[in-house]
Amino acid sequence: MSRLLTDEEITRQLGDLTGWTREGDEIRATYEAPDFPAAIRLVDEVAVEAEDMDHHPDIDIRWRTVTFALSTHSEGGLTQLDVELAHRIAQAASQLGATAGG
């Protein structure tokens, strides 16, 4: 089990994640992919990473816009797992030409 991050830790770590914001007990980011197939590839890449970590995001797909929301529900808030998965999502998005803030 991961421990909950403090507010200060969350703020500091979000500074390294372009486009990610905190909303209550979640961190969220929206990415705009070049086209719909690229958006689906991004979701597929994130699914592989999420399975590897056994930590799964909430995902909303709208045409070429994909929104990810992360929280460690078993802990009731944000943990290092959320930050690590956010970094993996950001890396996958970058490799597929998706930009944060879509």
Where are these regions (language model features)?
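Charge-rich alpha-helical segments
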Residues: 1-102
